[in-house]
């Protein structure tokens, strides 16, 4: 998805996908299933991208990781992003504790995939692709299940939230993102669609992203590290 965004977004936005171990070109690597370890790994691997004129974007688990990266940068005295854009996620302090309960077998994961939508039917018909997807999803869910907010302080960063009206995430959990920033530049954009509104209404999402970024980022060489 983010590779396509490179073609669709204005040239002043450079999209830098942060690929996670066990996925894509890193398929041969072991999954990292601990949230703090994943954040630490990404901060180290992308030290150059996480400098200067950059913003962070993430969808679903990626939103949580983007927030975690911003928190880690703050804690270590490194430059903060000019903006944090999060999509399809409850606020870190208001995550549903039961969301990933009993998601430890293939049947439950497949049912959840069908419920969330956004997965091509062809994938379910391919044992190899389905196995790969289930393993990745299970690893993602273990990362999310092990996450703990620990009373992290709000960030002094503009924060922009994208959400789907038909997503299972309760609106108040999404709106709680407003407590994660001390900056006056908070916004919440709602889109039609469920958890994968980001794909269903890609043009509208990208238009909102471009609209929000200039409010927080200035210049002609802006980097957008992105995590799906």
PLM feature spans:
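Non-catalytic, mobile gating and regulatory segments of ester bond hydrolases
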Residues: 1-228
């Amino acid at each position: 998805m983010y590779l396509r965004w490179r073609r669709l977004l204005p040239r002043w936005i450079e999209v830098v996908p942060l690929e996670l171990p066990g996925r894509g070109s890193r398929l041969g690597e072991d999954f990292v299933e601990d949230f703090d370890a994943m954040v630490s790994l990404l901060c180290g691997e992308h030290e150059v991208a996480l400098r200067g004129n950059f913003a962070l974007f993430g969808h679903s688990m990626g939103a949580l990781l983007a927030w975690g990266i911003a928190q880690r940068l703050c804690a270590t005295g490194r430059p903060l992003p000019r903006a944090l854009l999060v999509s399809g996620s409850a606020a870190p302090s208001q995550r549903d504790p039961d969301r990933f309960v009993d998601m430890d077998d293939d049947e439950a994961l497949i049912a959840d995939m069908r419920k969330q939508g956004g997965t091509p039917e062809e994938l379910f018909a391919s044992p190899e692709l389905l196995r790969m997807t289930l393993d990745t999803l299970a690893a993602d869910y273990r990362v999310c299940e092990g996450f703990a907010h620990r009373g992290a302080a709000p960030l002094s960063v503009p924060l922009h939230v994208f959400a789907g009206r038909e997503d299972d995430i309760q609106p108040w959990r999404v709106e709680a993102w407003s407590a994660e920033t001390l900056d006056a530049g908070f916004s919440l954009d709602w889109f039609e669609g469920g958890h994968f509104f980001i794909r269903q209404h890609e043009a509208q999402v990208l238009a909102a992203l471009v609209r929000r970024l200039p409010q927080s980022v200035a210049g002609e060489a802006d980097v957008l590290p992105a995590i799906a």
